[in-house]
Structures are given as C-alpha cells and as structure tokens.
Amino acid sequence: MLKWALIFFVISLIAGFLGFSGVSAATAGIAKILFYIAVIIFLVFLVLALAVGGAVT
C-alpha cells in the first residue's frame, strides 16, 4: 500500500510541476491548433461524403 502511495505522490509532483510551470501554456496552444486541424479535416470529409455519397449508392 505504501508503494502505491509513493507512486501517486511522485505522479502528483510531476503533474504539479508541469501544471504550475510554463509548459501547460505551451501544450494548451498546441492542443488548440490540433483541435482546429481535426475540425477542418472533419468538415472536408463531411463535404466529400455528402458530395460523393449520393453517387456511390
């Protein structure tokens, strides 16, 4: 049981260090960029499916 407590303590220290440093702001920016790229790809595939989907069936 003490082993798991120490493991979670170390994980919480690492998460706290990353959360309270500037790393979190940089990763949030990257996550926003990846989100918008995923939305654009989704919209492109949606338009393609609607345009070509009728021709397939």
From Swiss-Prot:
In the UniProt record, does the keyword Membrane occur?
A: yes
Sorted alphabetically, the keyword list is: Cell membrane, Membrane, Plasmid, Transmembrane, Transmembrane helix
- Protein's membrane topology: Multi-pass membrane protein
Q: Do the record's keywords include Transmembrane helix?
A: yes
Q: Where does it mainly reside?
A: membrane
The source's superkingdom equals: Bacteria
Intracellular or extracellular location(s): Cell membrane
Q: Which residue ranges traverse the bilayer? A: 4-24, 33-53
Gene Ontology, cellular component aspect: plasma membrane
Q: Which family does it belong to?
A: Belongs to the UPF0391 family.
Q: Which HAMAP family match?
A: UPF0391
What's the protein here called?
UPF0391 membrane protein RB0084
Species of the source = Rhizobium meliloti (strain 1021)
